[in-house]
Amino acid sequence: MSLSPRCRILIFDLGDVLFSWSPVTSTSISPKVLKRFLSSTIWQEYECGRLSEDDCYRLVGEKFSLDPKEVRQAICDARESLQPDDAFIDFIRELQTEANGALRIFAMSNISAPDYAVARGKPADWSIFERVFTSAEAGMRKPELCFYKYVVDAIEAEPSSVVFVDDRFENVLAARSLGMNGIVFDDVKRVRQALRYFVSDPVTRGMAFLDYRAGRLESETNLGQNVSENFAQLLILEATGNEYNRSFLLVKF
């Protein structure tokens, strides 16, 4: 018997998930100050397309007492540092291949039109995405619920069939509030495991584990200690009909 995978739609953030960047620039603007103005309401308006690039840099300069030319240079340096995580993107492609093309991949990012144009010029595998949703195009940004609803409506999906991956907890929380499955991108290994859990067939995954552990199907305590006993192996034998190279414990009386 086989069960259907729980989810067939993945939505990824771009920055700090599929792309990395450095806040260290050639200017006098410190990484701390750079991150502060990137989180400002001015920058949020810029990301939604309500401010031009020049106006954004000017207003940021006024608010944070910075030279607009320095702001521009700092952003240019940050753009230059932007690099795709090819290994993780390859992993997504692998999931897509394993699903025989049934897995739909999207991106959803708070990003200005100029910054997105720079990102698209990076040597990344953009073909994995069915569509990329940007705050600049939508006029909305995460964690505003209207942005999530806009995306779900556009891809014609049930929220429960979607896995949303983002590095910011508040963005994931907003997705979960609409019924999506959410993963906080904090540890690559853990995120990979979680994605496989959501998109792979549970029976196939279980059988693959039994094959991998053949001959080593011992019980284990919560402290990581192996317990040599026959009950678990007999239970697996009864349930699957497969011996999995078991080695029974010989009990002498």
Question: Each predicted region: which residue ranges?
Answer:
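Asp-based, Mg2+/Mn2+-dependent phosphohydrolase catalytic module
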Residues: 1-12, 112-113, 117-205
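Short, acidic loop-to-helix structural element flanking the phosphoryl-transfer center
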Residues: 6-9, 70-106, 145, 188
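Generic structural signal for small/hydrophobic residues in well-ordered secondary structure
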Residues: 13-16, 49, 95, 107, ...
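Short, basic/glycine-rich phosphate-binding loops at helix/coil junctions
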Residues: 37-39, 59-74, 130-132
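Hydrophobic alpha-helical core bundles mediating ligand binding, dimerization, or RNAP-core interactions
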Residues: 56-61, 75-79, 115-119
